[in-house]
């Protein structure tokens, strides 16, 4: 057995659980005193008179200490068991007392009192020379020490009361005229502060002045001895402000508020408890000014409590929302007396109300808009972190109307309080927030939101920028979008100006004004500089391009739609460039450590543009354009080649024809491929039935009219395909038979074929009454020659793959 284990130590299993307990303050002092004699104990260990055999015999019946042996009470108290490791035979109690007397360890309370005593001495010395700058600095230092003492439950030290009386007497005794401006300013500041603090500690000051000597001999005033500010002491680990609501009537609202303000930002402060205490204090407010200050303090505390979370919990978000709404209600009721503004001057003392301006209004420094910004951001974060396919997402989305109401209400308040020359600049942020909630919606949805928002808005407010007369027509909605975007376009910030244009283009394209939206985008030249913009702006631009393409398709402008979407759909990361990937995916693949930057790359699910709809629109346009051209090319007609992307119908048909098994259509892509095959055969009815069975068409607001226009266009393109395929076999074509075959009027048949003959320079002509088309035999290849040409091409490709070196020669 090792000699490091003492013979007298007896292991007790019942005491093993206490080994993990934290040391009390008294035990820590004993442990620190024992550590002072460690050096002497080590020496005495090696000079121990006991023999090695003694250790062996002692250890024969001993049990091991265990991992926490140094926490044992025998070790800390210096008992017989286990102390041979630290103490030799010559160790005595007198040695321990001598070592302990060499170093005095002061407690935190003693250190704090010493600092106050030092400041008191400096104030005494400064009084002799009328050095009010030093007096003010030391007095402020003592005040801060009092706050620290109350936070640690030390009460109100007597030395603090002495310093207050000392400075108060010095102010009263100072009758000399002070010429130095800095000293005079320090004197006036000290006079105001000591007056304020004296009023808070009237009882203690009166007791001190009755008998200063006996008062100084007494112990410090404890927390539970007086109803002073010490009752609001903050503990070492958590904030204990539960007594504010019951005792603020004795000490006043602002002294209690100062404790809350001093507690903010400190370590180990429970923000939830702090918010609850501030909420309780709010119930004791009496004047509108106190309520405004209380809300301006409470709301940031609520928002700060969730800074380390992915988003603010919904119950806390709703509590913050109610606080902001209540603050706006108070400001609305007292708009002619109190106003909260970012332009207000800083107020050194919250207890003193700011001076009224020439209109009799007292402006308080604060930012309602910042609160609304944070609420809106937290709302978006909660949507991004919620499963979009769950009922929780729909329930959370109901709060969008509430946040939009608050945004409109804030805009009305700022319009009423801000100076007219600064309104446009300062309202730009609220305009962006308002546009963010409506630009991507149809007029029907915006109308619902506007009506609900104006119902809860105060009737005393009128908006000069977006006037409301009770009727929400389409012209009113377009006017709101135009007014807000025009205001943003006047800003010097280039990002805001680009964003304003894109908002307007998106809304205009969504509401069936394709040509206006297209001209607006081209004139703005945003596309020329979009690659240098921030990612969120690039995502918005890509969304605008997609919406332009969909708008063109709704009007059956097939060529325009195909041209707009072709470049965008060539990307293999369509979901990412539209900002429609999940936040978890962005976090996993992003190199940025900033959560705000990652969230800018994502949009809530209800703002997404359905990717299936984008695919079906583009492939349908590709089908109507490329199938007739492919047929004309294979029939020997020289055509102009057009670029095609990976998602074009031409590429899809190439893969489809190479597949070994061709089953019935299952996916969206399969339905379009089978529709293309039927179109090549001239069977337009079957082709249209396959297209119509795609469920993604239901996502279009006017799907019925779009499908009707699509059917007519499909008939025309099927006619062209039929003509290119069969013109080699016929010398004459009857317009009546073609009209019956494609269910089109004869004049429409004649018009379509005449356009084809002119465009591709085909040797064909109509008779006088245009009932028959005569086709001259040209140099076009036969079907057999076409198949042979395809086989020859495949043979060449196969040879190049098998013998690549020969192919290069």
Swiss-Prot record:
Compartments (UniProt record): Cytoplasm
Q: Show the coiled coil region(s).
A: none
Q: Which GO annotations describe the biological process of this protein?
A: formation of cytoplasmic translation initiation complex
Where are the stretches annotated Disordered?
1-102
What coarse category fits the chief subcellular location reported for this protein?
cytoplasm
PCI domain: residues covered: 605-780
Classification via InterPro entries: EIF3C, EIF3C_N_dom, PCI_dom
What terms describe the molecular function in GO for this protein?
RNA binding; translation initiation factor activity; translation initiation factor binding
Q: Keywords in alphabetical order, please.
A: Cytoplasm, Initiation factor, Protein biosynthesis
Q: Where is the composition biased (Acidic residues)?
A: 18-30, 37-59
Q: Which GO terms describe its cellular component?
A: cytoplasmic stress granule; eukaryotic 43S preinitiation complex; eukaryotic 48S preinitiation complex; eukaryotic translation initiation factor 3 complex; multi-eIF complex
Q: Which family does it belong to?
A: Belongs to the eIF-3 subunit C family.
Tell me which HAMAP family the record gives: eIF3c (MF_03002)
Q: What does this protein do?
A: Component of the eukaryotic translation initiation factor 3 (eIF-3) complex, which is involved in protein synthesis of a specialized repertoire of mRNAs and, together with other initiation factors, stimulates binding of mRNA and methionyl-tRNAi to the 40S ribosome. The eIF-3 complex specifically targets and initiates translation of a subset of mRNAs involved in cell proliferation.
Q: How does it assemble?
A: Component of the eukaryotic translation initiation factor 3 (eIF-3) complex.
Could you tell me what this protein is called?
A: Eukaryotic translation initiation factor 3 subunit C
């Amino acid at each position: 057995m090792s000699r490091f284990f003492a013979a007298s130590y007896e292991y007790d299993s019942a005491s093993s659980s206490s080994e993990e307990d934290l040391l009390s303050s008294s035990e820590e002092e004993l442990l620190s005193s024992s550590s002072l004699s460690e050096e002497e104990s080590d020496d005495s260990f090696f000079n121990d008179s006991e023999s090695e055999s003694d250790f062996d015999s002692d250890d024969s019946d001993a049990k091991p200490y265990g991992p926490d042996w140094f926490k044992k009470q025998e070790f800390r108290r210096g008992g017989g068991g286990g102390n041979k490791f630290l103490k030799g035979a010559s160790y005595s109690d007198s040695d321990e007392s001598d070592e302990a007397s060499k170093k005095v360890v002061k407690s935190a309370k003693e250190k704090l009192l010493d600092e106050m005593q030092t400041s008191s001495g400096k104030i005494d010395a400064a009084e002799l020379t009328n050095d009010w700058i030093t007096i003010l600095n030391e007095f402020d230092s003592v005040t801060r020490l009092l706050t620290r003492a109350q936070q640690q439950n030390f009460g109100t030290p007597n030395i603090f009361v002495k310093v207050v009386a000392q400075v108060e007497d010095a102010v009263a005794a100072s009758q000399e005229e002070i010429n130095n401006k800095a000293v005079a300013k320090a004197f006036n500041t000290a006079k105001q502060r000591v007056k304020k603090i004296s009023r808070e500690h009237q009882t203690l000051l009166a007791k001190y002045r009755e008998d200063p000597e006996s008062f100084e001999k007494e112990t410090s005033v404890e927390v539970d001895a007086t109803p002073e500010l010490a009752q609001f002491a903050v503990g070492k680990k958590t904030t204990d402000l539960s007594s504010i609501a019951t005792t603020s009537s004795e000490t006043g609202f602002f002294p209690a508020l100062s404790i809350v303000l001093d507690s903010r930002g400190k370590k180990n402060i429970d923000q939830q408890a702090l918010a609850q205490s501030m909420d309780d204090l709010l119930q004791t407010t009496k004047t509108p000014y106190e309520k405004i200050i209380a809300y301006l303090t409470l709301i940031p505390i609520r928002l700060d409590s969730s800074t380390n979370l992915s988003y603010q919990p919904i119950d806390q978000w709703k509590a913050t929302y109610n606080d902001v709404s209540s603050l706006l209600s108070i400001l609305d009721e007292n708009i002619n007396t109190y106003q909260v503004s970012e332009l207000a001057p800083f107020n050194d003392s919250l207890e003193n109300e700011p001076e009224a301006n020439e209109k009799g209004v007292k402006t308080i420094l604060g930012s309602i808009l910042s609160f609304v910004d944070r609420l809106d951001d937290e709302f978006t974060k909660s949507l991004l972190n919620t499963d979009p396919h769950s009922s929780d997402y729909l329930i959370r989305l109901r709060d969008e109307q509430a946040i939009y109401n608050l945004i409109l209400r804030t805009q009305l308040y700022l319009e009423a309080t801000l100076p007219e020359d600064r309104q446009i600049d300062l309202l730009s942020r609220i305009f962006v927030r308002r546009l963010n909630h409506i630009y991507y919606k149809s007029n029907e949805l915006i109308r619902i939101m506007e009506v609900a928002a104006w119902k809860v808005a105060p009737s005393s407010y009128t908006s000069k920028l977006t006037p409301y007369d009770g009727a929400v027509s389409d012209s009113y909605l377009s006017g709101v979008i135009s007014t807000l975007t025009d205001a943003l376009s006047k800003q010097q910030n280039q990002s805001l100006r680009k964003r304003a244009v894109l908002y307007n283009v998106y809304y205009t394209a969504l509401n069936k004004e394709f040509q206006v939206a297209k001209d607006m985008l081209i004139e703005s030249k945003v596309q020329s500089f979009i690659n240098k913009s921030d990612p969120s702006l690039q995502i918005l631009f890509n969304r605008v391009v997609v919406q332009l393409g969909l708008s063109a398709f709704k009007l059956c402008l097939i060529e325009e739609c195909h041209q707009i979407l072709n470049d965008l759909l060539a990307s293999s990361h369509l979901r990412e460039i539209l900002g429609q990937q999940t936040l978890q995916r962005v976090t996993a693949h992003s190199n940025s450590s900033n959560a705000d930057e990652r969230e800018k790359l994502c949009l809530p699910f209800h703002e997404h543009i359905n990717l299936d709809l984008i695919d079906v629109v583009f492939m349908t346009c590709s089908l109507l354009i490329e199938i007739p051209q492919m047929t004309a090319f294979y029939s020997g007609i020289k055509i102009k080649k057009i670029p095609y992307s990976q998602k074009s119908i031409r590429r899809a048909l190439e893969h489809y024809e190479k597949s070994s098994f061709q089953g019935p259509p299952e996916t969206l892509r399969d339905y379009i491929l089978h529709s293309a095959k039927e179109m090549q055969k001239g069977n337009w009815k079957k082709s249209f039935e396959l297209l119509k069975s795609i469920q993604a068409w239901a996502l279009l607001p006017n799907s019925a009219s779009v499908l009707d226009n699509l059917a007519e266009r499909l008939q025309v393109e099927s006619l062209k395909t039929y003509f290119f395929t069969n013109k080699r076999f016929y010398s004459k074509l009857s317009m009546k038979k073609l009209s019956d075959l494609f269910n089109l009027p004869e004049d429409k048949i004649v018009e379509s074929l005449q356009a084809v003959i002119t465009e591709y320079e085909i040797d064909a002509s109509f008779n006088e009454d245009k009932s028959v088309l005569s086709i001259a035999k040209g140099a076009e290849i036969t079907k057999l020659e076409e198949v042979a040409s395809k086989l020859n091409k495949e043979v060449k490709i196969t040879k190049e793959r098998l013998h690549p070196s020969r192919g290069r020669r």
